[in-house]
UniProtKB/Swiss-Prot annotation:
InterPro entries: Alkaline_phosphatase_core_sf, BPG-indep_PGM_N, Metalloenzyme, PGAM_B_sf, Pgm_bpd_ind. Catalyzes the interconversion of 2-phosphoglycerate and 3-phosphoglycerate. This is 2,3-bisphosphoglycerate-independent phosphoglycerate mutase. NCBIfam families: pgm_bpd_ind (TIGR01307). It comes from Aster yellows witches'-broom phytoplasma (strain AYWB). It is an enzyme of class 5 (isomerase). Pfam families: iPGM_N (PF06415), Metalloenzyme (PF01676). Its EC number is 5.4.2.12. The active site is at S62. Pathway: Carbohydrate degradation; glycolysis; pyruvate from D-glyceraldehyde 3-phosphate: step 3/5. The gene is gpmI. Belongs to the BPG-independent phosphoglycerate mutase family.
Length: 512
């Protein structure tokens, strides 16, 4: 390790609010965070809306947060880009969408829209489904179009799926199948869940429901099953995916969509995100001559055409460190591993020089309220070993607990999650202090500080609240800012000049 070390500790989903009721952050016993806030320079950061490249008033999320944290500039998001394309009508002349239409017409086949039906704006948006349906109607394909609806219940209300389904039916959609995001959009290598949805879409291996969609959804609710956990079912057996069909995956955020997209487009791929090495879809029914469009680039294993390419970000934090010959470490558990790697690196799969990664498996539980400590202790132990090795100049670490447990809507479990992170944070920072290093502590967005909505129902979504930022250097004074200012601040602490591409500013107002 060189004479300077700076670690970035991301407390995922830990926002700030004056509202104390149903606030897991306030109700938790956090003696170490209390100590840090009392004894070290701290400020607040904006982590939502236009300050992170989202539409005004749009809640932040982990992808957006880590992009801005690592890029050191406001990164305009896919949601903003696609919304603009709809407004200026370029959406309706998009080359990739038109290729899918041509494929369907040439093969006299079907076109399928897959994705999270939600206006949460985190992974997808209802307006994008409607714009695509408008385009398909213009091309006389309304009767060939089938929607496979993945219900949300995390970034939106737990029982809001029924209203989104009504909305889409009223718009004219033919909904062929439904599945909760727990099954369709898993990102923790639970391939058995993805397999259920894959087989439903391609092999009709799921219950066929004859009741109305509204009654079917209400039956789930009556059984205590919320939108996230709706088990896959078919409403139109003739609307499933066959050879020569086209699929448009409407999710613009890749981390939860990439596994099902890989299964559909490249089922025998070897995947970095699959610990077993294979997707295990080789033995399933394969769909031949499938034309797949993804809204954005998911990953290299997904064989698709991409409707909206992202602007390449140059001289992000990780690249600056690598180009100087310095050593860096990224560490997280499975749920947030893409965030400290892919997203923190500007939405790219980078192989940076002298950059190591540690992936700690997330616990195999149905929901994280059953194990609110998740893998925080294992992350802590691995981080301490790495820090004491004195190999690294900088560390990027994510504690997922406040966000992932917050998404369950269970207040007591989320309080335990926050308390776990508090104790683990103390151990990590004590290790950093022992090697004469400094730490920046930040959250990427809010969540755990609001566990019930205004009607008293569980609140499982993110918030637009400010987030804390702490620097363990008593010789500085901080000013408020946004997430894009964190990377310049870290470079400032390392006494490295920020590159011109970083338009964020150091939050260090002056030395004391």
């Amino acid at each position: 390790m060189t004479k300077k070390f700076v670690g970035l500790i991301i407390l995922d989903g830990l926002g700030l609010t004056d509202q104390k009721e149903n606030n897991a952050f306030h109700l938790a016993k956090t003696p170490y965070l209390d100590y840090l806030l009392k004894n070290f320079p701290n400020t607040t950061l904006k982590a939502s809306g236009e300050e992170v490249g989202l539409p005004q008033g749009q809640m932040g999320n982990s992808e957006v947060g880590h992009l801005n944290l690592g890029a050191g500039r406001v990164v305009y998001q896919s949601l903003t880009q696609i919304n603009k394309a709809i407004r200026d009508k370029t959406f309706f002349t998009n080359k990739q969408f038109l290729q899918a239409i041509e494929h369907v017409k040439k093969n006299n086949s079907k076109i399928h829209l897959l994705g999270l039906i939600s206006d949460g704006g985190i992974h997808s948006h209802l307006d994008h489904f409607k714009a695509l349906f408008d385009l398909l109607k213009e091309n006389n394909l309304a009767n060939n179009t089938f929607l496979h609806a993945f219900t949300d219940g995390r970034d939106t209300g737990t029982h809001s799926g029924i209203n989104y389904i009504k909305n889409l039916l009223d718009y004219g959609f033919n909904i062929a199948s439904v599945a909760g995001r727990y099954y369709a959009l898993d990102r923790d290598n639970n391939w058995d869940r993805i397999n259920l949805v894959y087989n439903m879409l391609t092999s009709k291996q799921a219950p066929v429901i004859t009741l109305s969609l509204e009654k079917t959804m209400q039956n789930f609710y009556n059984q205590g099953i919320t939108d996230e956990f709706i088990t896959p079912f078919i409403t139109d057996p003739n609307g499933l995916i066959d050879d020569n069909d086209a699929v448009i995956f409407v999710n613009f955020r890749p981390d939860r969509a990439m596994r099902l997209a890989t299964a559909l487009s490249n089922p025998c791929a070897t995947n970095a995100f699959c610990s077993e090495g294979k997707t295990n879809f080789c033995g399933n029914k394969l769909v031949n001559n499938l034309f797949l469009v993804t809204m954005t680039q998911y990953n290299v294993q997904v064989k698709s055409v991409v409707a909206f390419e992202k602007k390449t970000l140059k001289n992000i934090y990780g690249e600056v460190i690598a180009n100087l010959g310095m050593h860096q470490l990224r560490i997280s558990e499975t749920e947030k591993y893409p965030h400290v790697t892919f997203f923190f690196d500007g939405g790219k799969e980078l192989q940076l020089k002298n950059a190591d990664r540690i992936l700690i498996p997330s616990p195999k539980v149905k929901t994280y309220d059953l194990k609110p400590e998740m893998s925080a202790l294992e992350i802590t132990n691995a981080a301490k070993t790495a820090i004491f090795s004195r190999k690294y100049d900088t560390l990027i670490l994510n504690f997922a607990n406040p966000d992932m447990v917050g998404h369950t809507g269970f207040l007591d479990a989320t309080i335990k999650a926050v308390q776990t992170v508090d104790s683990c944070l103390k151990e990590v920072l004590n290790a950093i202090f022992a090697v004469k290093g400094k730490a920046c502590i930040v959250a990427d967005h809010g969540n755990a500080e609001k566990m019930k909505d205004n009607q008293g129902n569980p609140h499982t979504a993110h918030t637009t609240n400010l987030v804390p930022f702490i620097v363990t250097d008593k010789n500085v004074v901080l000013k408020p800012g946004s997430l894009c200012d964190v990377a310049p601040t870290m470079l400032d602490l390392l006494e490295i000049k920020k590159p011109q591409e970083m338009t964020g500013n150091s939050l260090i107002k002056k030395l004391v």
